[in-house]
Amino acid sequence: MLGIREPDIYGRTTYADLCQLIEQHAQKIGAEVELYQSNHEGDLVDKIQKAYGNTDGIVINPGAYTHTSVAILDALKAVAIPAVEVHISEVDKREEFRQISYVRLACFATITGHGVNGYLEAMELIRERYES
C-alpha cells in the first residue's frame, strides 16, 4: 500500500520505487540486499530466523507490528543480527499507541521520520558498524 495509503504521511513512493532505490544504494556501497515484505507476522518471524548465520544486518520496518509483536522482538533477539528499525513517518510524534515499539528493544538504532531515505540511512549504519 506504500504510495497509496495516507500519502500525506507516507509519501507517494511506491514499494517498487523503494525497492529500486534500495537496490541502487546497495550497489553504490557494495552491499548485497534481499528485499522482503509480508503482511503476516509469522512470515516475518520465519524470515528473520532464516537469516541466522548468513546475514550481516537487518533493516526492518515492522509497520503496525512495531506496537504489538513480541514474536518479532523475540526473533530479532534470538538471531542477534545487528538490526535497525525504520519508519517512514515520525511515529513518536503520532498517536500515543504508535509511540510504543517492542521491536526497538532488539535494534541498535531506530530511524523515524526520514521518509524512504531512512532505509538508506539504516544501510549506512549497518555498513559503518562493520567498518569500525
In which residue ranges do the predicted regions lie?
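Short, glycine-/small-residue-rich phosphate/pyrophosphate-handling segment
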Residues: 34-35, 84, 92-132
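Short glycine-rich anion-binding loops that position phosphate/pyrophosphate groups of nucleotides
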Residues: 1, 63-66, 89-91
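Short acidic/histidine-rich motifs immediately flanking catalytic phosphotransfer sites
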Residues: 51-58
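Short beta->alpha junction loops
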Residues: 32-42
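Glycine-rich phosphate/diphosphate-binding loop of Rossmann-like nucleotide-binding domains
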Residues: 1-29
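Short acidic active-site motifs
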Residues: 43-47, 68
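Short Gly/Thr/Asp-enriched flexible loops that form oxyanion-binding sites at enzyme active sites
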Residues: 69-78
